[in-house]
Amino acid sequence: MSRDWLCRRLRLSPRQSYSLVRSGYGPCVSSDAVLSLVNKSRRNIAAPFDHVPCDILTADELAQTPELAESGFVPRDFLVFTRRENPNNQPPFLHLNKQTTRFVKSLFLDWLAERAKDAERTGRRRFV
């Protein structure tokens, strides 16, 4: 991937990108190097990032985002999806890749809204 794209995505300066991702000094960076760096940041092995894009947040990190922190919970159903290797009923936009959960935030919120409507119609709670 392009180093410029990485800088825009993680909100880094070019100098920071070279000091953090040392995979060569060319214009490209491997996605494995970025994933490794983000996971080290998650485990407090490396300094935490100021900004991690929403599509590589884990479910626990997502719970800390302002939109879901206001509601006070991440649905247990969704946490189960993220912890199973081969979920049978996962949302179509969810992909598991090692320790990173990749999804589009707007699709996730639409999925939650749709599930909430189904629960209201049937009279049973799907979450918590």
Predicted regions and their residues:
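General secondary-structure propensity
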Residues: R3-L6, F108
